[in-house]
């Protein structure tokens, strides 16, 4: 379980959340980095474009990246926005989230070895490394390569150091796999370039959240009308499934937007 130093997030924070309940007027979500704290996503903050049905955008149990827009510390309530998160913020958060998950897994295993709680691990290891270096998992990776002084300098208690380094060494080197597909994209619509960009952006939504092992996805031209779809991850099965899902999304959304998309090679 992931523990935060603060009970409530701050306005402007970008967070990973899980959709729990979807209503006509909005959605209740839980903030994964704040112990499952409930937050409210108003309908007006779901999309910057008109959406006929909120369930076309939000699905229960799906991970989403949100921005905190209001915090009432007296009542303990939090409101968030989906539409205010930029593509760059979403990409960076997904990469950070994968690091946080790796950190959490390492701390869980080490705390079990030491017969201590996961909260102890976060307080005595993660928070100390964060205070000293900013990014706990990067600090642990440095310690694996450079030695225990990295941990000692941050004030990590001695009891954690040896088992932490041993466990972290098993998790720091992940082999990457890359899956690619070729497609052709054509449209006779006015503002066709913008329309194609919108279709591609929609097709990539939630892919990195739905597949935890996926590190990066992108679609780029190799000479119009040909485009390449690249999926990079650490699990070949997930990478293949994600690629198929993206191409399926492209074809489906393309039909809805009068953009003709066909597969050249997968």
Curated annotation (Swiss-Prot):
Gene Ontology MF annotations: ribosome binding; RNA binding; translation initiation factor activity
NCBIfam families per the UniProt record, alphabetical: PRK03987.1-1
HAMAP family named in the record: eIF_2_alpha
Superkingdom of origin: Archaea
Assembly mode: Heterotrimer composed of an alpha, a beta and a gamma chain.
Keywords: Initiation factor, Protein biosynthesis, RNA-binding
Domain S1 motif: 12-83
First and last residue of the signal peptide: none
Listed name of the protein: Translation initiation factor 2 subunit alpha
Physiological role: eIF-2 functions in the early steps of protein synthesis by forming a ternary complex with GTP and initiator tRNA.
Entry similarity comment: Belongs to the eIF-2-alpha family.
Family annotation (Pfam families): EIF_2_alpha, S1
PANTHER family per UniProt: EUKARYOTIC TRANSLATION INITIATION FACTOR 2 SUBUNIT 1
